């Protein structure tokens, strides 16, 4: 079966919320429900889901080759922006013209793009060797560079969650008898009966301290 995780799609978030957290009222899927929404951007939906679609036969080889070519163009452009360094003499007139702080030393095009007020489109004025990219590809290049640090932290959180998913919770656990586990957490865990530590960590009312108690109880801490 094809199982989409919380870090791969909003439908994965929706299913996980309904199965693990439950709901007493109509459920509305909003971006705020995802802790990984920086990874679940509109502009990178194809990079997240096309490989999965190809794997299960929903995407044919011709379309997948087009996808790979697009990803190669995006990757090459990000590399070019990182490696293209401009001197203050080259960049400062442009920066001052848009009200940005001028450079004191050389900076790459990627460094300039990381400034909140500068867009990829604006950089065309001082970027003579820019290749042709579609609007969609330009948006992905800009988003990937601007939010790289934040995305890296979220990817770290995803890896941590995957590791927690490997820790299974026995079905027979008496949560109310675990010393150090808060009453609210014990009640929620007893009612929902998560299958893994990862699922337990996603339950509203179960905090990181409760997860630490569970790991100690299981001898995994």
Segments and roles (model prediction):
Residues 17, 26-28, 54-56, 60:
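Phosphate/diphosphate-binding loops
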Residues 1-26:
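Active-site-proximal substrate-binding core of FAD-dependent oxidoreductases
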Residues 7, 33, 39-41, 45, ...:
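Extended, charge-enriched "interface" segments that sit outside catalytic cores
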Residues 2, 19, 28, 139-142, ...:
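Alpha-helical protein-protein interaction elements
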